[in-house]
Amino acid sequence: MALLQISEPGQSTAPHQHRLAVGIDLGTTNSLVATVRSGLSTVLLDEAGKALLPSVVHYAANGQVEVGYAAQRQQSHDPQNTIASAKRFLGRGLNDIGDTSHLPYQFVDVPGMVQIETRAGIKSPVEISAEILKSLKARAEQALGGELTGAVITVPAYFDDAQRQATKDAARIAGINVLRLLNEPTAAAIAYGLDNASEGIYVVYDLGGGTFDVSILRLTKGVFEVLSTNGDSALGGDDFDRRIFHWILEQTHLQAPNPADTRLLMTASKEAKEWLTEHTSANIAVTLSNGKTVDLSLSRTEFHSLTQPLLNRTLVPIRKALRDASLTVKEVKGIVLVGGATRMPQVQQAVADFFGQAPLTNLDPDQVVALGAAIQANILAGNRHDDELLLLDVIPLSLGLETMGGLVEKIIPRNSTLPIARAQDFTTFKDGQTAMSIHVLQGEREMVADCRSLGRFELRGIPPMAAGAARIRVTFQVDADGLLSVSAQEQTSGAHANIVVKPSYGLSEEQITNMLQASFTAAEADKHARALQEARVDAARLLEALEAALRQDGDKLLNDEERTEITRQMEHLRNIAQHEDSDAINKAVDALNHATETFAARRMDASVKQALAGQSLNTLDI
């Protein structure tokens, strides 16, 4: 009789079997895939020996889908059907994208995520990104000789729920099991921390093709803690290309070039940028579709001057991230550069000037994110003990819910470490209330009108009882990928409801930055507004309770003079509550409470007498 192999619950039946897992850097300009071999993280190469896969997808006339270099070669000839930098559009609406005049695509403005019209039909950024992921998966499985267990895919630190979910959806379409989404700066920290055994405060300066992220990290004995993050999701190496592109238009007096010429000039701009990394001048020679020739020379000094405003833009998020972490420049031990754009000399010089020290460039800035993701994937696949490395990401904006008076009660504050779960108890406002609307919000302001709505759901089945008697526990959970779920449960009946927040499309980096800035600017005004609304809510609650008490017991327990005085004080509170003075409202509430103390005592006595009526000492449960 054959023996049945068993194992402890939760353990593999083959605990020492190496599982094939990879780290994927799904980049705006280029994408990579890496894995851990013999304890070392290495990037997997294609058949031509190249590590980078251009994040470009071409929909050919014969129905074939080309990805990478093959697609890139079609950009000049067929720009409308060759989609580059689709990552910029993940989880975004057309209004979020901003200036599209330089893009040759036919955008379809539909509710939710923007779509792009191609000869293969209307394609979403999710579908386009899935083609890139399919290509990386095929490369990995061919190189590793087997089927992947899963992958860790990196995303910019400031990707919100919609953008992260869109990334997961793209992976699902590509047939990839996502072990985890990992912030790109955190992935870089993993790679550098393990290679160099670094400890202390580090800044990860990540300037990719389309996004800029900065993270402040504390590295201590294998623990990577993200203290704060900031950035700009509409700033990257592509913007440096566009500065050269617009410079060419100015020099040649070209106006509104057609899509093919736009692609030719953008390609020439990118090549000039890369040439200037190693040389002091670059020649730009392009023959346009009308036969006209562009022949210009751009010096490194001119290029630095053109792009100085872009460099200055990267310093603003750095200052904000340092302030959020309560750190100064002097406390930073090192700066890690990530992203191909950081090869530009003016970028390295700007970073060195700001921090007063040269940045670290030990690892290839194009590969470092994928290398770190591969290390994390190896751990999550069970190939290493997960106690060897602990990383802690943070959420960029506070999460909370609406309370009476349009106020926001923050449940999870911004920069909280992920994953995280927080619970808080709430109660009903009215007598006999059997349902409660839960409104989930994101932002730093005190009033609902100034924050972003993430979703709503209703909790029904609350047992009818006096206002304030019910206990509803609301739990916020944010997983390691930054996705939020909210649940509410009434403690006595067990009534339960929940929501998983997947917004139709997300916030841009600029909007997030503006929300944070507005919270700082309006802090004092928000404080007064909250105090006023809290006072008004207290007043309304007291007035409603007194009206019910007077209807029930006023005639029995009060004489005419007492009732008139209470009514006068109630009317005074109603009038004061219409004004903008929270102190005056609180004083009126205190005065009304004082005026009704005798009435409250009589009601309590009457309730006790009623409860004891017909009872003897022997029948009481004492």
Swiss-Prot record:
Swiss-Prot/TrEMBL keywords: ATP-binding, Chaperone, Nucleotide-binding
Cysteines joined through disulfide linkages: none
InterPro entries: ATPase_NBD (IPR043129), Heat_shock_70_CS (IPR018181), HscA_NBD (IPR042039), HSP70_C_sf (IPR029048), HSP70_peptide-bd_sf (IPR029047), Hsp_70_fam (IPR013126), ISC_FeS_clus_asmbl_HscA (IPR010236)
Molecular function terms, GO-annotated: ATP binding; ATP hydrolysis activity; ATP-dependent protein folding chaperone; unfolded protein binding
Keyword Nucleotide-binding: yes
Gene Ontology BP annotations: iron-sulfur cluster assembly
SUPFAM superfamilies: Actin-like ATPase domain, Heat shock protein 70kD (HSP70), C-terminal subdomain, Heat shock protein 70kD (HSP70), peptide-binding domain
HAMAP family: HscA (MF_00679)
PANTHER family, per database record: HEAT SHOCK PROTEIN 70KDA (PTHR19375)
Physiological role: Chaperone involved in the maturation of iron-sulfur cluster-containing proteins. Has a low intrinsic ATPase activity which is markedly stimulated by HscB.
Homology family: Belongs to the heat shock protein 70 family.
Name under which the protein is recorded: Chaperone protein HscA homolog
Originating organism: Methylobacillus flagellatus (strain ATCC 51484 / DSM 6875 / VKM B-1610 / KT)
